Amino acid sequence: MRMLRWLILSAFSVAGAVQAQGNQDSAAASAPSASIGAPVLRTSPGLRVHRLPDEKIPAFMEADQISGDPDSEVTLTGNAQVRRVDGIIKGDRINYRRDTGDVDVQGSARMLRDGTLITGPSARLNVDTYSGEIQEPNFWIGASGGTAQARHADIFSKSQMRLSQVTYSGCPCPKPSWYIKADTVDLDFDENEGVARNGVLYFKDVPILASPYLTFPVKKERKSGFLMPTYGTTSNSGFDISLPYYFNLAPNYDLTLVPRYLSKRGAQLGGEFRYLGSGYRGVAIGTYLPDDNETGRDRWMYRTYHRQLLGNGFYTDWDIAGASDDNYFRDISELGLNTASTTYLPRRGRVGWSSTYWQTYAQVYKYQTLQDPDAPLAPPYDKVPELWLKGARYDWGGFDAEWVSTAVRFQRSLLNGRRLGPDGDRLQTYPTVSYPIGRPGWFLVPKVGVHYTQYRTDWYNRDWNRIGLSNYKRTESRTVPIMSLDAGMIFERDASLFGKAATQTLEPRLYYLRVPYRDQSALPVYDTTLADFSFDQAFQENIYTGGWDRIANANQLTAALTTRWLDANTGFERLSLSAAQRIYFQDQEVTLPAEQPRKNVRSDFLVGATAALTDTLITDVAAQYNPYDNKWSRGMVSARWSPQRLTTVAVAYRYQRDPLPGISYQPQGQNQVSLAVQWPIHRRWYGVGRVDYSLRSEPATAAAAEQSPRVTQAIAGLEYKGDCCWVGRVVYQRYAVSAADTNTALFFQLELTGLGALGTDPISLLNRSIPGYQSVVPPTPTGTTFERYE
C-alpha cells in the first residue's frame, strides 16, 4: 500500500527533468555624455507604457443587437462578446454592468485568457476581479496543453479557481487514453500548483493508481514534488526502484533527492544540487548505500563541479569525484547508463586568468584509479601542482607568434605498495613563430620553434637499484629546435557523380618536418605516450602525445591527397576520398622505454572514404595498411541505411592489431563487429537492438580466456505506440563490466503524453547505442499564450 501511494504521488507530480536556469543580468553600455549645447533625444511621455489598474482597463462590446445604457448596464444579444486587452468573453446573450464589471453569460459561454479557453452553457463573473462561477465547464489549458471537464467551477481571481467533479487529461487525442478523475481540484496558476483530492488515474478506462491527496504543476514550469518513479532489474543489484523528489528552491538553483531500493543490496539515498548565477554555475551529486547486503560495507560516490568568473579576466573551477571502492560503478551502475567502464575519477581544482594575448592557470590535478582485478592499470601521475602560461599574437605584421610554458610537479600513487616510477618536477617552454600565406586555391605556412625542457627527478635509488636507475642524474635538460613547412592547393572543376551535376575538388597537401636528434634516454616519462597514426597526426610535430617527455627526431615529408564531390545545387558532400603517407629521410633514434625504433623508409598507408550517394545510405571507411608486411594495422568500415522515419540499420567493423609484447603505451588490439537496428515490426510495434561481438581469439590462458570471442554488449527492446497519448517500452541490456564479468539490466516504461513516464527512460541509452535512432513520439512544439486567438 505504501508503494502504491508512492507511485500515485509521482504519477501526478509531473515536474519532469528540468535544468536549473538563472536570469543572466546584462549590463547596458553607457552612452557618452552629450556636449554642451548639443541636441538631446528624449522619449515622449506619450510613448511610455503605463500599467492601468484592472478596473480602468477599457472594454469593447460587440453583438448583433445591443440595448441598455452604455454607462451602466448593457445587454448584448446574438454573437455577443466583451473584449479587453487581457481577455475575451463570448456567449449568446451577455448582460454587462460597466460600473461594477459584472458579466452574466447565457448560452454558449466562452472565455479566453492567457491561452486558456473555458466553455460552458452559462457563466457569471466579474471582468475587473476575474471572479465568478461557471456551470459544466470545459477547459483547454494553454499553459500545460491539457483539457478538463467539471460539473462546476468557482473562479476566485485571475490565477485561482476550484473545480468540482473533475476529469483531466493532457492527452491531445479526441478520445484520451489516460485521464484523471477527482472530487475537487484547486488550481493556482501563479504558484504553478494544482491540488487534487480523491484522485484516480485511469488508463484505457481502467483505474491503475489512486490517492486521496496529490499535487501537480499546472504550467510547463518547474515545481516541487515527486517525479516519476524509475524501476527495473539488474543481475548485479536485483530489482531496482527509485522515487525522486524535486525541490524548486529558487529560480536559479534546485535539489533532487532520490530514495532508491536495490533488492540485492539495500536502500540507497542519492541527491543532485544544481545552481546557476551571474558568473557562476555548478552541480553536486552523491549517493550513499549503508551496509551493502552483498559486501557488508558502506558504498558511496560523489562528484562536484563548479566554475566561477571572478572579474578582470580571473576565473576558478573544480571537478572533484570519488567512490568508496574500485567496484562501485560495476556493482551499482545506473539503469541504462554503462558507468561500469569508469576507470579514472578526477580531483582537479584550478584558478586562471585570461586576456587578449595571455592565458594562464594554476591547478592541482589528481586521480582516483578504479582497478579491475582482471586487468590492473598503472595509476597516472598526479600534477601537484601544474602552472600553465600561453601568450599568442596572430597576424602581427603577417606573423603568428605563440609561447607556451608549463611547470609541473609529478607524483604517482603506489600500486599494491610498490613504486611504479620516479617522481619529479618538469619545466617546459616552447616559443614558435609562423608566417601563414593564404591565397585563393593555395596556402603555405612556414613555422619555427624551440622547445626547452628541464627535469629535476626523484629516482628513489634504493627502490630502483635492481634495474640500474641509480646512475641517472637528478637534473637534466633538453633543447630541441623544430621546423616545419605546410603547403597545400585546392583545384575545382565541374563534374558529375552517377549522372548528377557535381563540383569535384582535388586537394594535395605536403608537410615537411625537421627535428634534430637529442639524446633523451635519461629523461623520465610522466605523461607521454605514442600517438595513433592518423590523418590528423600525420601533420603534427611529434609522434608522441601528452606532455612531450619525448620529442622524436624527424626529417620527413607527409604527402596527402583528398578529392571531394559536392552536390552542384546544395554544396552537400556526396563523396570524399583521402590518402596519406609519410616518407622518412632519417631513422628513428628517440624512443619510449621498451619501444622498438622505426627503421622503415615509409610509414603505413592511410586511406579513407565517406560516401552519401543517396539521402538514405551513408558509408565510412578508414584504414591503415603496412606495406612492409602486407597487413592491415587498423581499420573501420561502417554503413547506415535510413529509408524512412523510425527505420534505420547500422553495421560497423573495427580492427586494430595487438601491440608488440611488453608494450604498454599502445592501445589493446580490437576485432569487433557491431549491428544496430530500429525497425517497424507490425503497425504500432517497433523493434530496437544492438549487438557488439568481439572476434578476438586468444591463447588458452586464464587471462586470455576472458577476452576470447564474446558479446561485449547486447541491447534488445520493443516499443509500442498506442496512439497519440501513450507509448510502452521494454528494453533488455547486457554489457561487460570488466574483463571477465557482465551485468544484465531489464527495465520497462509507460510514457503518458502530457503526464510523464512511469519507469526508467531508455531513450538516452538508445540514442547512444543506435545511430540515427528516433523516438516514436515526435517532440511537441512549445505552446505560447498566443497559441489560440479569437
Swiss-Prot record:
The keyword Signal applies. It comes from the Bacteria. It is found in: Cell outer membrane. One of its GO terms (biological process) is Gram-negative-bacterium-type cell outer membrane assembly. Pfam families: LptD, LptD_2. Its main location: membrane. Keywords: Cell outer membrane, Membrane, Signal. GO terms for cellular component: cell outer membrane; transporter complex. Residues 1-20 form the signal peptide. Component of the lipopolysaccharide transport and assembly complex. Interacts with LptE and LptA. Belongs to the LptD family. Together with LptE, is involved in the assembly of lipopolysaccharide (LPS) at the surface of the outer membrane. This is LPS-assembly protein LptD. The lineage of its organism: Bacteria, Pseudomonadati, Pseudomonadota, Betaproteobacteria, Burkholderiales. The gene is lptD.
